[in-house]
Amino acid sequence: EHDPSAPGNGYC
C-alpha cells in the first residue's frame, strides 16, 4: 500500500 504519511511519497 502507499502510505501518504511516509516520506518520499509523491502521491498527488
From Swiss-Prot:
One of its GO terms (molecular function) is pheromone activity. This is Tremerogen A-10. Its main location: membrane. Keywords: Cell membrane, Lipoprotein, Membrane, Methylation, Pheromone, Prenylation. It is found in: Cell membrane. It comes from the Eukaryota. One of its GO terms (cellular component) is plasma membrane. The modification Cysteine methyl ester is found at residue 12. A lipid is attached at residue 12 (S-12-hydroxyfarnesyl cysteine). It is a lipid-anchor.
